[in-house]
């Protein structure tokens, strides 16, 4: 005969059993366990009794042999509540929930089928038995309005509403949180996350191995392994491994970045020794065009501006060149006319030489030199003066041509530099898309929901033509507190985050 059983609700007409009734505090409705379905033979291994107190009904599973030892109690949702030293465990079983709902429907004459079997009872009891004997060391919860929580060897939460998690973790001030071995949150509302992270200032945050915020740097934030907000650097933010802020209201962005003055966002990074103080540079990509005087200008804006200057200069050079050419042609024509007028002479009817203008007959000057030898010196002087003017005009033309050539070379150099900057912008654009894809992937990671359990989660993300993979783990300490960490990878780059969740 099969050992399988099904809890079946019996009314007073089934198997001659009596349904007991009475007041809420004393009411017990018994449910029997048949040994085999449909044969009318009822076993005596288990008994399910519905008990009530203060209007809260539960189902208690007992062994019917001997003393009827109580195995466990579950509510109408199928939850088994186990209370330990400061810790409450909840076991939920769908079959128990199914049974409780079936019990309620039986009163209304509805179907009495359900899924609770003897194997379900044994499985739930084994879980209850194990949790009742589980001991968690290094865990402390102080009840009351100033409750504090500490978890880990030598962990200490001494501030009001403070939390210390990890070996040697310290949360000394009100609302302080320290998570990680030897992490210390020593300022009011301060948060220290990571091994050896120190948040000494009020309202400060230090996240990452050995991340540090000095006690005088109020509102300081240091995120990244060995990131540091130094003395008196109030409201400073160090983001990146070994990033350091030494100035007020300044931001050190990127690994090894170090600020140089107050109210500054600095992305350069330290490359030399302490005495050398050599700094490298980074490219800030993915920017919109600046619209205010205090905004940063993009290379695209500069390209358009330089292009406009180039077109304007080119147009001006063309106009000036045309003016110079017209002026030179005009002056040359005038000189030619004057020269021509002065290389002929008029001859009167009596053979006297006159000016060529208006003369009926003219002859070449050379022909008239025999008769006018006394005037040769004056004519030579006039011709020499004309030649000097022509020479000066020629020199002016050559000078303008050289200036045009120099301007052309300068424009070519600007064009080469702009091409180099455009290539750098394209590379930065790809890097920003990878960062966006990593951020999207990290956002897809789930945090843990079940108390006392770790979870492992993975997610993918993308932005434009870039993709990223993120993986993470988490742990829920209780219903109010959980922590998780994740890392994302994309084309050789990686980013990470660590978070802690408090629910009030």
From Swiss-Prot:
Q: How does this protein lie in the membrane?
A: Multi-pass membrane protein
Which residue ranges are recorded for the region named Translocator domain? Answer: 454-504
What residue spans carry the region label Right-handed coiled-coil (RHcc)? 297-342
Can you supply a Gene Ontology BP term from the record?
protein secretion by the type V secretion system
Q: Which residues lie on this side of the membrane: Extracellular?
A: 27-453
Name of the molecule in the record: Immunoglobulin-binding protein EibC
The gene it comes from is eibC
> CDD domains of this UniProt entry?
LbR_YadA-like (cd12820)
Q: Where is this region: Saddle domain?
A: 343-368
Q: Into which family does the record put it?
A: Belongs to the autotransporter-2 (AT-2) (TC 1.B.40) family. Eib subfamily.
